[in-house]
Amino acid sequence: MSAAILLAPGDVIKRSSEELKQRQIQINLVDWMESEGGKEDKTEPKEESKAEGSKDGEGTQSESGQKEEGGKETKDADVDRRIHTAVGSGSGTKGSGERANENANRGDGKVGGGGGDADAGVGATGTNGGRWVVLTEEIARAIESKYGTKIDVYRDDVPAQIIEVERSLQKELGISREGVAEQTERLRDLRRKEKNGTHAKAVERGGRKQRKKAHGDAQREGVEEEKTSEEPARIGITIEGVMSQKKLLSMIGGVERKMAPIGARESAVMLVSNSIKDVVRATAYFTAPTGDPHWKEVAREASKKKNILAYTSTGGDVKTEFLHLIDHL
């Protein structure tokens, strides 16, 4: 069996580094993050200089201390904004706890916490007997592939219990940048619809009360109708931010699939690389949506070779496809 050298995008290699080490495959990774980090460091002093200009008359030492504290508060606020549970009822964790206490015996009112031991749900069942859903097909495929649990994608149903996969869990599941952007767009649409729909629900309930007064004979039926129709409006759409694998599994059920690693002797791949220097000796390359800015040039040079195998991601879980290719080359 001849040894193969496989070219792939840097972020794909980085996400798969642990599995590659298990297979005793060498890694040649050209890291592009350092250069980007240098650019970010250069832009930060500009923001500080603007802050200094707006605080004339104050001491230099007190200004620097306040700026450091302000920077921490801003970061904390950004994190808090990302963590939310219920659309249309406030983005803080308190709203989630109130909703949970009113509607069901749940113990995971705190967002992002380790709610694995709470009565958050059995299998993929959420509050009020509903089922947890996700916002994109890619996330649903990744969860099914990793944990063996089939989960539905949200289809504009109300009420609904939606899982928002947050950054740390996105990396764990191998969600692509496009998949992350799609989830963000759907969240924005949901917030917009929920905000516009609140007034419409209030008007609808007011009109129903007027009709109930006009039809005195049907008063009892009107009361029953009002109760049943107001319940889903009160429940609405719940969004649960999930950062940990433990919490996700407590919500949807299932266990992580442990695949036996394939050793170097069983795999034909000797080296994986994103370096343009390895194009000359590469025997195959794998392309996928990537944040590696240098990959486009590497792939272009690789495609010019006559005797090289080209593989492309089908749009599923990129990490899973990459490792599957390595195991079957």
From Swiss-Prot:
Region entry Disordered, spans: 27-130, 189-232
Enzyme superclass (EC): hydrolase
GO CC terms of this entry: viral inner capsid
Residues making up the signal peptide according to the UniProt record: none
Positions of transmembrane segments: none
Repressor found in the keyword field: no
Keyword annotations of the record: ATP-binding, Capsid protein, Hydrolase, Inner capsid protein, Nucleotide-binding, Virion
EC number: 3.6.4.13
Basic and acidic residues bias (residue ranges): 36-58, 65-83, 96-109, 189-207, 215-232
Residues binding ATP, per UniProt: 110
Molecular function per GO: ATP binding; hydrolase activity; structural molecule activity
UniProt catalytic activity: ATP + H2O = ADP + phosphate + H(+)
Biased composition (Gly residues): 110-129
Main subcellular location: virion
Pfam family, one: Orbi_VP6
Keyword Hydrolase: yes
Localization terms from the record: Virion
Complex and partners: Homohexamer.
Similarity field: Belongs to the reoviruses VP6 family.
Function text: ATP dependent RNA helicase essential for RNA packaging and viral transcription. Possesses ss- and dsRNA-binding capacity.
Protein name (record): Helicase VP6-A
Taxonomic path: Viruses, Riboviria, Orthornavirae, Duplornaviricota, Resentoviricetes
Gene that this sequence comes from: Segment-9
